[in-house]
Curated annotation (Swiss-Prot):
One of its GO terms (cellular component) is cytosol. Its EC number is 2.1.3.2. It comes from Ralstonia pickettii (strain 12J). PANTHER family: ASPARTATE CARBAMOYLTRANSFERASE, ORNITHINE CARBAMOYLTRANSFERASE, MITOCHONDRIAL. Belongs to the aspartate/ornithine carbamoyltransferase superfamily. ATCase family. This is Aspartate carbamoyltransferase catalytic subunit. Pathway: Pyrimidine metabolism; UMP biosynthesis via de novo pathway; (S)-dihydroorotate from bicarbonate: step 2/3. It catalyses: carbamoyl phosphate + L-aspartate = N-carbamoyl-L-aspartate + phosphate + H(+).
């Protein structure tokens, strides 16, 4: 009889206690996060006098970012504070890890300070899993991006954005364009889209920037930008992750833009009501033209806004589930 492995993200009852990856989560769990996030959108409403709810009052949330981040770290901090948590942002460059202390020693010391939740971004794939294996049962871990592996909250906020504008996934064609090989966002988006029943997921990019096995994930692969964009409902652009590249995978940024940059002419090949997304940071003139990034079909800034509600939902859900 084959051995089965428990999902480390779930309690014995199948509830979400950590968010480490979208892979392995059910449609019901993803939908629950999106539905809960919808309820939190009103908390961030500009007309609301007090933008707080007491869900995490008395809880301590540690943001541990071992890689630089602006949007993700800031939106996690805002999300935790709107849930009334105490938030501690650890300055990793000045911390003991830069002096040789191991990752688990750091976690154990912070746990001794009564941490209730760790939000972790790390250059090593699997680091949040390692932390989740070693924390106390009442402590929760959220992956804010680990190496090339996963960025589950970005994937969820992308799904929230798509659902907000398109309502239903079952008739959608979504194109993910660019450096998919090095993109943890692309992996999370693909798993989320297929789990939520998206009709067709496309990957567009040069052969050097597309990983093997995409077809086995149910993804249609295109190397020609124009062909890949025909009739799509959603375009998700990705930046070139030069910091993760080894060797010359591309001739130049200018040549890349000529072949794969999203211009208004190329966007016209998609459906007239197609939306344009980007997880940021954008490289204008490399993967996207400013006229498109700032155009009427762009929902890029809305993604950032929705990210707060989605991260509030994730934190609120995991905090309520213990073995």
């Amino acid at each position: 009889m084959p051995k089965t492995f428990a999902n480390p993200q779930l309690t014995k009852n199948g509830e979400l206690k950590h968010l480490l990856s979208i892979e392995g989560l059910s449609r019901d769990i993803l939908t629950d996060v999106l539905d809960t996030a919808q309820q939190f959108v009103s908390v961030s409403d500009s007309d609301r006098e007090v933008k707080k709810v007491p869900l995490l009052r008395g809880k301590s949330v540690f943001n541990l970012f071992f890689e630089n981040s602006t949007r993700t770290r800031t939106t996690f901090e805002i999300a935790a504070k709107r849930l009334s948590a105490d938030v501690i942002n650890l300055n990793i460059n000045a911390s003991s890890t830069s002096k040789g202390e191991s990752l688990l020693d750091t976690i154990n010391n912070l746990s001794a300070m009564q941490a209730d939740m760790f939000v972790v971004r790390h250059a090593s794939s699997g680091a949040p899993y390692l932390i989740a294996e070693h924390v106390a049962p009442h402590v929760h871990v959220i992956n804010a991006g680990d190496g090339r592996h996963a960025h589950p909250t970005q994937g969820l906020l992308d799904m929230f954005t798509i659902r907000h504008y398109k309502k239903d996934f079952s008739n959608l064609t979504v194109a993910i364009v660019g450096d998919i090989l090095h993109s943890r966002v692309a992996r999370s988006d693909i798993h989320a889209l297929t789990t939520l029943g998206c009709a067709e997921v496309r990957a567009i990019g040069p052969r050097t920037l597309l990983p093997g096995g995409l077809e086995h994930m149910g993804v249609r692969v295109f190397h020609n930008m124009e062909e890949g964009l025909k009739g799509v409902d959603v375009v998700i652009m990705l930046r070139l992750q030069n910091e993760r590249m080894s060797g010359a995978l591309l001739p130049s940024a200018q040549e890349y833009f000529k072949a794969y940059g999203l211009t208004q002419d190329r966007l016209a090949l998609a459906k007239p009501d197609a939306i344009v997304m980007h997880p940021g940071p954008m490289n204008r003139g490399v993967e996207i033209d400013s006229a498109v990034a700032d155009g009427v079909q762009s929902v890029i800034l809305n993604q950032v806004t929705f990210g707060i509600a989605v991260r509030m939902a994730v934190m609120g859900i995991v905090a309520g589930n213990n073995d």
